[in-house]
UniProtKB/Swiss-Prot annotation:
It is found in: Cytoplasm. Belongs to the ClpX chaperone family. HslU subfamily. ATP binds at I19, G61, V62, G63, K64, T65, E66, D256, E321, R393. Its main location: cytoplasm. GO terms for cellular component: HslUV protease complex. The lineage of its organism: Bacteria, Pseudomonadati, Pseudomonadota, Betaproteobacteria, Burkholderiales. It comes from Ralstonia nicotianae (strain ATCC BAA-1114 / GMI1000) (Ralstonia solanacearum). Keywords: ATP-binding, Chaperone, Cytoplasm, Nucleotide-binding. One of its GO terms (molecular function) is ATP binding. This is ATP-dependent protease ATPase subunit HslU. GO terms for biological process: protein unfolding; proteolysis involved in protein catabolic process. InterPro entries: AAA+_ATPase (IPR003593), ATP-dep_Clp_protease_ClpX (IPR050052), ATPase_AAA_core (IPR003959), Clp_ATPase_C (IPR019489), HslU (IPR004491), P-loop_NTPase (IPR027417).
Amino acid sequence: MPETMTPSEIVSELDKHIIGQQKAKKAVAVALRNRWRRQQVADPLRQEITPKNILMIGPTGVGKTEIARRLAKLADAPFIKIEATKFTEVGYVGRDVDTIVRDLAEMAVKQTRESEMKKVRAKAEDAAEDRLLDVLIPPPRDIGFAQPEEKDSNARQVFRKKLREGQLDDKEIELEVAAGMPGMDIMGPPGMEEMTEQIRSMFAGLGQGKKHRRKMKVHEAFKLLVEEEAGKLVNEEELKHKAIANVEQNGIVFLDEIDKITSRSEHGGGEVSRQGVQRDLLPLVEGTTVSTKYGMIKTDHILFIASGAFQLSKPSDLIPELQGRFPIRVELDSLSVDDFQAILTQTDASLTKQYQALMKTEDVELVFADDGIRRLAEIAFSVNEKVENIGARRLYTVMERLLEDLSFHAHKSSGETVTIDAAYVDSRLNELAGSEDLSRYVL
């Protein structure tokens, strides 16, 4: 379970996908572990222990967002990643910051429902199986004889065996299922998400309880009936209470692009709204109560992780109150040639493995030689230095350019083996990488 993972185990999991940035990984791992530690503390003191929010500072493409993505998969907790630039000050047209907590609540309810459904899945499958057998072999009318019941029982066992073995999967049956409301989306004005959600939930309940007959194949019917039966076994009210508790105690919010809402004294214009977003974030990060359709949610123990490149601004450009709410500062390093080489070879789903898998579908064997990978890393680093530093994302453009012709003519090279060595890389990329004007527009 993720909550019992030690910080070193969390870091080793992140190492599979992100190269370097040990400071950021350690900070995130400790913050995640502290959620578990807090749960072990006795109650009066537990309420006083609040999470220490993290601010990650570093150039674009070095792993800030990737750490958040991998953390979301790793943390068995309600997690939401949002861009700070999406929000506006209350009173302006746009989304206000309270929607962060509402979205987190939606995520938690979905997560809790999936978890509860898994617990009752075995019972739901049995009930769905019985309902399918009732359709395949309608039960006989009661006419006072015992013998037909025995025959029916034997027939049910035969059909049950066939059903479990998948022999009846393609048989078409007519089934009575719960009628869902026709898909209807309500487009509300910006900033009125709560009202729109209330109207949507009001209309959602209109079609409940109604049933209609549908023709479908047995395997489709089984999936539908399992969902329906599991829904009956799950207590919705209890589910909502669990979800709210999960958000309040374990919720994690990743605020990306926080540097884009800083106020810079030398720039005028839309600074009022930007500062307003920072002021609106203050109570949310410090701890407040937000109204959602599932109930009131306290944000006191939600962990906030913010990140930004801070190329045009500094962390000190944030309003002082917000700076104080992010006590842990972590600086991420720019990527070196060795880092680029490691990204191409050591990560679990590296670009080289992805392209090899894609070419394999055309029966083309792609082999990356060590000197070829080193040359790719050098070119990516060089272009970043000369033009604009976009971090690891530069590898996407370099790799696409390198394999452009091969990808286009792959169907003609079926059964061949293509080796990507330093000479191959130079023949495709040297001219582009050497010319600053060309690399500016092409790479």
